[in-house]
C-alpha cells in the first residue's frame, strides 16, 4: 500500500469518527469479526448463546446467496436453541436503524481455502459487515474497480460467500475526488460484460442534482449513520422475481421523500417531473409501499391507464416485492378492497377507468353509495402518468368525492401554459389543463437535461433534410415519399452503425404509413433487380385497425388520436391494407398473426425491435426489423436500447416531439453515442422551442447539452486526436504507422498508445453515425487517417491491448497502477456487420472467385478479421486457416464451417498433447481436465491436484509443477473460452 493510499484510508476513518462511528482497529481477521458480531447479536436479542449455538447460528445464516442474506438482514428470523426452544431474533434493529451500533474496520483479512484477500475499509451495523469501501490513488475507472470486485467474488470458496461478508449490501470505490457505489448481487446480476452493459453504478447527488463525488462530502451526505441506515432499509429494493438487489438513484429517493413528507405534513397535492427513461415505476412503487406502513393515511391507490393494462404494472410492482399488490379483476373487486380493513388491501393498483365507474353516481350497482363511509378518510392517489386522455374526466370526481384526498402525479413531459394547446390531429387543435392546475406544484424535478448530463440518457443528433429544386417545401411540409425512402436507404447503415441498431419512421397518418410500406417494397425490389449485392431493409409497419366495437382496440386507441381519426374514413380499406402488411410480416418472419388478434402482432413487433443484442443468438440477423413504420404507436412509452434512429415525416411539437425523440436515446455503450433524428420536415423551430420548454433548468444554452456537437467540431477533435497520436509516436523516435506500434518499448508507452488510439476510435465511431456529412467532410476524414490505415491501427491496438490485458489478468493487484486502471473498451472495435457467419460466408466467397475477379484477397480478409475485437481470441487461428485453404477449390459455407471446426479441434489436440508431454502428464487426462473447465466455466484447484496425483510428488514439488503447467495452460484456456469468464482463473493468476 502506498503512503497516499494509507492517508486516504486514515482520513476516511477520522471522518467516520466525526460521524460517531466507532473505530475498531482490533478487528483484522475472521475470528475477531465473528466475536464482535456475537457480542452485538447477544446484546440486541438479550440472550447468551453457548459456543455450539453460536456456531450453528453462524452456519445457518452464512450463505452464498446474496438475495437470501439481504432478506435475513431485514427480517425477524427463527433459530432452535440447544434445549429445543425457539429463538426469534434479528441481526440489526430493523424498527429503528439509527439505534444500531455503527463501526468502521480496516485492513480486514479473510483467508479461506482458495481466497486470501485484504479489504480496505468495512462498515459494520451491529457487527454485520454491510458496506465495503475500496480506496485507490489512481484516477479510478469505475469499470476497472468493479471488475476487480467481480473477480474477487468469482473465486470458488471466496470470503464473500463463506463468511459474514455475505451480508454486504453496498460496494463503494473512491480515489478521494471521485466516488461511486453499487449494490451487491448474486453472480447472474453481478457479471461484468464490457461489450454491452455494466453493473448499475451510481454517483450520489444533492436534491438539485449536483454531484457529490469528493469522498469527504460523500461520507457526510451518504454515510451518516441514519442516512446509511435509510439507504439500506428504505431505498434498496429486493426484486423477488429476479432475486436481485436494486439501489434507487438519488433523484428517485428525493422524489419518494418529497411525496412522503407532503403526506406527513398534509400539505396538498403535487407532481414529480422525471424525464422518460428515468425509472418512474420504481419510484412510484417505493412511494406506495412506504405509505403502506404510514399510519397517517387509510388507503393508497396507484392509478394507471387501461391502455397500460394494470396487469403489466401490477406484475412490475410484484416483481419488486412478491404479492405486494392484488389484482382487481373488475370494479366490484376494487370497491370491496377499498372498503376492506385488511393490511393487504391498503395499497391498491387500479385503472382510471375502474375508478371512474366506482365514482359514477349513475351506475346501477350503487358503487358510489357503498363508498360513502370512505368520503372523509385520508386517501392518497398516485397517477403513473398525469396526462392520459382519461385523466381529466376523473380528476374532478375524485376531488369532489374525497375532499381529504391527496393526489400525486408522475410525468416526463409536463403541460405548461405554452404547450396546453397544440395540434394533436392534422388540422385540429387539442387543449390540456396544465400540470400545475391539476396538481398544484412540482415536488421534484429530474429533467432530460439532468439525465443527459448523468449519462442516464443520450444526447440527440438532428439531421434536417434539405430539399432541392425550384419550389422546395416550407418547414412543416412533407417531401415526396420516394425521395424520403431513397434518403433512408442511403443513410440507414450509417445511422444505425451497420444495422447494429434499428429505426422507426414516424408518418403523419395511416394512409401515409400504408403508402410508405408499399413504396418501400417496390423501390427495394427494383434495387435488388439492378444490383444482386443490394441488402434490403426488413421493414415492418404497425397502426391500430378500425375498432368495429372491439374493446381491446378501443382501449389501445384512447391515446392514439391520429389513428382514431384516420380509421373513421374508409375503415375497410385500412383493414385490408393492415391485413396485407401482417401477411407480409408472417411470410418474412415465419409467424402466424391475424389482425383479429392485433395485440399479439403488436407485441411481436416490439419484441423484434428489442431483441438486437447479439449478432445471431437472440434472433438471426435476417429475422430482425430494421425500420418500423408508425403513426402514433411506439412514439410514447416504448423503450429499446437497440432503437437509435427516428425518421420523421410528421409534424411534432412540444411534449409530442420530446416523447418521440426520446425513443432513440436509451444508453447502451460507446457504440451508441447519441440518438439519431432524421427530420424530413425541417422542424428546427419546434425542436428549439421544445428544448427551451423542457430543459427545466435556468441555463443559457440548453441545446448544447441536448444536441451533439456539429460534425465540423467532431472532425476538428478527431484531427487533433490523430495529431496527438502522431506526436507521441514521433517522441518515441517512430513514424506514425501501424507496424511501428510493435516497436514501442515498455508497457508505459504501450498504455499511452492504447489510450490515445482509443480516443481516436471513439471520435471515429461518433463520426461514422453522422448522417449529414458533406462530401468534403467525408474526404477530410479519410485524409486524416485513411480507411486502410485505420483498419491496421485497429489491428495493432487489439494486439497491444491483448498483451496488456494478459498482464492485468495475471498480476491483478500486483500489476503496475497504470495497467490496473486500463479500460480497453473493446466494444469500440467490434463491427455488428462482421460476425462469425459473415466471416464464414466471406471465406466461402473467396474460394469461389476467379483469380482475376477477386473483390477481396486473402490478406485483405485477414486484415478485416484482425481489426475486429470479436475475434481477438481466434484471429490467429482464422488467419492460419485462411492461408492454408487450397487454391482453386471452390467450397460452400457449410464446408468452410466444418473445415474450420476440424482445424480448431486438431490444433487444440496438438497443443494439449505437446503440453502434456512437456509436463509428463497423460494427454487424455489433461484433455478431460481442460474440457471440464470449459464446460463448467470454473477453474477447480482440487481437480488440478487430481491431475498431478500420478506423478507422486511432494507438496512443494507438486506446487511448483502445478504453477509451471498453469503458466502454459492459462493463455490456451482464455483462448478456448472465447472471451467468456472462467470463475477462479483470474484470482489463480493473481495469486501466482
Task: Outline where the language-model segments fall.
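Signature of the SF2 helicase/ATPase Hel1-core->accessory helical subdomain module
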Residues: 142-145, 152, 184, 191-193, ...
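Short basic/glycine-enriched coil/helix segment immediately N-terminal to the Walker B
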Residues: 125, 264-268, 341-344, 361-379, ...
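ATP-dependent helicase/translocase motor core
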Residues: 2-299, 308, 312-324, 343-344, ...
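Catalytic cores and motor modules of nucleic-acid processing enzymes
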Residues: 14, 42, 50, 268, ...
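Loop/turn-to-beta-strand initiation segments
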Residues: 299, 344-347, 377-380, 404-408, ...
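P-loop (Walker A) phosphate-binding loop of NTP-binding proteins
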Residues: 275, 305, 508
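Inter-Walker segment of RecA-like/P-loop motor cores
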Residues: 319-361
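Conserved C-terminal RecA-like helicase domain
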Residues: 346, 476-630
